[in-house]
Amino acid sequence: FTSVIPQVFVPMASELAVPQNKAQAVGMVMSGLLVGILLSRVFSGFIGEYLGWREVYLIGAILMFVLWIFIYIFLPEIQPNFKGTYGNLMKSIVELVKTQPQLRLASFRGATGFAAFSAFWTTLVFHLEEAPFFVGSDVAGAFGLIGAVGALAAALVGKVSKVLSTSKIIFYSILIMLISWGFFYEFGYTYWGLIVGVILIDLGLQAMHVSNQTIIFGLDAKAGNRVNTVYMTSYFIGGSLGTFIAANAWDKFQWNGVVAVGVFFTLICLISHILFNKNNK
């Protein structure tokens, strides 16, 4: 339930940044969020392998307490933009979904992109336990360090947006994700193939994610948290769906089944962008 807290930082960064630096601010915060997710896999993999799963949660709780202190001390207090009741707030979110086609499209892209991403990361540990790898969760977690390279590279989206349109950045980002699945299919039984694929899928997802959020935060300056609520709810629903389908695909078809799931969601993401994005050229 409280894992929603980091998502509040994204609209906060957008609100605090000057207009010309909004994309860079969102990119920086989102890179931190995704790198944290990836590094947590390294952390949990090694700690779980050598100390046990309980220690993972104990150390995590201590770190969150320390982080709470830093947030309390250093983050500025921002007054809410919405002055109505909670019921009216919920109605306004529904109204945003109805009246903002770019929000709906960005949410769908985010959901399908994160579904493909989650399909890979959910089943990677199963894949590495099988031939020809025969390794444990510590090695699977170490791939998070590799993925962090792609996530950090995506922080440059803010600078790239000054050269390319957001629509084109999203298009190329989805293509990068699609290429990553090509590596997983052709070279997924080699370490180097997985490494290249991990860098590409993290780069592609993060670049698209930052671009999506740049779009939605530009829709209504006073509705940053509300549009982010719609987007991130869709995003995590997509991730849960990708996890569920990929786990079942692994049971029945092993690695090839997972690749098929990833390619399916990525293609749906690409097709929706091409068909429904009015600014796509």
Where are these regions (language model features)?
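A late C-terminal transmembrane helix in Major Facilitator Superfamily
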Residues: 218-255
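Helix-loop junctions on the cytosolic side of multi-pass membrane transporters
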Residues: 71-85, 275-281
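Pair of pore-lining "gating" transmembrane helices in MFS-fold secondary transporters
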Residues: 99-119, 199-200
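Cytoplasmic helix-loop-helix junction between adjacent transmembrane helices
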Residues: 1-31
